[in-house]
């Protein structure tokens, strides 16, 4: 297991996959490395389900932190092509957190859930000794819809186009410059530009827009491991290859300056909010047009091929063993 971040594929295959409880016929897609959600068949309906830790970052302001935390959770089911619909959430709060602080967090969660049509159906909230920010709980999101509308995470097919929104290190850039503005060597204008990237660190609405616009075959939120990690995870899960042209990938303002200042590789740094999609070429323009109308920065960056592995500018890449942002966060904290 890695010292920081999610477990790797080898650890999962050795310790987790052999012990998944009872086998049930209604589990259509169970736990799989690099796959954002599980899938249940309930009668004639499909249920996408995903669980994530809840991270509350007080320097963001508690209401904004609540919205940010919820978006991270909902993204994992939004990439199923089904709109997020239900939420179970648990808070294990530090004793130092005041009632007013929690009320602000909850207002952020409520407002974002209401805007996205998500209903909170159950949960648990308490203060406990030993709990501390930012990791203060966990949440499970569900998306319920027609089975025919599900976009499987392993659905990429040879001949599909590969699309990317936002590009590398959007979350890393926005988060680190917001949390540690005085410790990063950027001028005021560049710092403000970089901090604005945090508002783009959610792919929920982009995923819903793309799914409604055209024949999307797979979607993935580029979280830990960044874009390189996301490319490898998608290709591996589908048993296909990706050929990527780096120059076509959009790069948002402030990203390169921030990553240069921190000495990190933007392509392997966490990029929540950057959506990787594979699309039937007949629908690529429709998907790009819909994303553009929503104000998203998106581009066709490559294609899906027969075979295995990912190449970027004709050079083979592997999934990063450690997210590039972790060391920077540790150094700045």
Language model region names:
Residues 1-59, 110-113, 117-118, 329-333:
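Extreme N-terminal cap/leader segments of soluble proteins
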Residues 3, 291-333:
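Acidic, Ser/Thr/Pro-rich beta/coil linker or hinge segments at domain junctions
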Residues 29-32, 48-50, 120-124, 164-166, ...:
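General beta-strand structural signal in soluble alpha/beta enzymes
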Residues 58, 86-176:
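Glycine-rich anion-binding loops of enzyme active sites
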Residues 62-87, 107-115, 203-209, 229-233:
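Small-aliphatic-rich amphipathic alpha-helix that forms the alpha element of a beta-alpha
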Residues 96, 196-271:
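Active-site-proximal betaalpha loop/short-helix elements
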Residues 152-208:
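Short, acidic (Asp/Glu-rich) active-site segment that either coordinates a divalent metal cofactor
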Residues 279-284:
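Helix N-cap motif at beta-to-alpha junctions
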